[in-house]
């Protein structure tokens, strides 16, 4: 089976980045850096708790605006300038995807009355965990010059430690970006 590096990134997330960090652990983010020929793919996943402060739908317009501001902080990482990388594609989970219409507090519209009524209604808002996911794809003119990637948004989320899987021409590896670290050396 011939699987491209780019295609492998979602698989890494699905398997907990090869067990580098347990799936959905508050305070721990997962990232991947993959180089395939001249293509650089960067992926990031973090618990919403560490990005928004909560893992539930916004309860007001003001809260919705605040959540969007927090999501907007997650900007494209910066590959080393010498590599000559140009951003080709960016996918960041947006607020509408995290909390689809009708996924909020409208129980009358989507409540199944055939289930056990002994549950706690608060569980609807707090029981499941959600993650922010982002992927950036770059084309690089001088991929051999790629010696670092800076993740500027990590400075905005000091509660996070980020486990990074590396899939590079020189080999595979793992690194940790501790709270406050934004620059990931690749050498």
Question: Residue ranges of each PLM-predicted region?
Answer:
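Bacterial N-terminal signal peptides that target proteins for export
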Residues: 1-9
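Catalytic-core segments of enzymes that bind and process phosphorylated/nucleotide-bearing substrates
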Residues: 12
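N-terminal signal peptide c-region/cleavage motif recognized by signal peptidases
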Residues: 15-18
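N-terminal soluble domains immediately following signal/targeting peptides that reside
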Residues: 21-110, 123-187
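Intrinsically disordered low-complexity segments with strong compositional bias
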Residues: 110-118
């Amino acid at each position: 089976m011939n699987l491209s590096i780019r295609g492998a990134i979602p698989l890494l997330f699905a398997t907990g980045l090869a067990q580098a960090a347990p799936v959905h652990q508050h305070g721990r983010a997962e990232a991947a850096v993959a180089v395939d020929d001249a293509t650089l793919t960067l992926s990031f996943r973090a618990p919403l708790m560490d990005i928004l402060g909560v893992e539930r739908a916004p309860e007001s317009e003001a809260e919705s605006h605040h959540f969007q501001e927090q999501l907007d902080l997650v900007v494209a990482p910066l590959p080393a300038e010498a590599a000559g990388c140009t951003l080709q594609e960016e996918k960041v989970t947006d607020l509408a995807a995290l909390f689809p219409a009708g996924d909020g507090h409208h129980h009358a519209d989507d409540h199944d009355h055939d289930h056990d009524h002994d549950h706690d209604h608060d569980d609807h808002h707090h029981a499941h965990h959600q993650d922010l996911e982002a992927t950036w794809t770059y084309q690089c003119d001088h991929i051999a010059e790629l010696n670092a990637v800076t993740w500027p948004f990590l400075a905005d989320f000091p509660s996070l430690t980020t486990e990074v899987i590396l899939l590079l021409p020189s080999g595979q590896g793992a690194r940790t970006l501790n709270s406050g670290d934004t620059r990931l050396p690749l050498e």
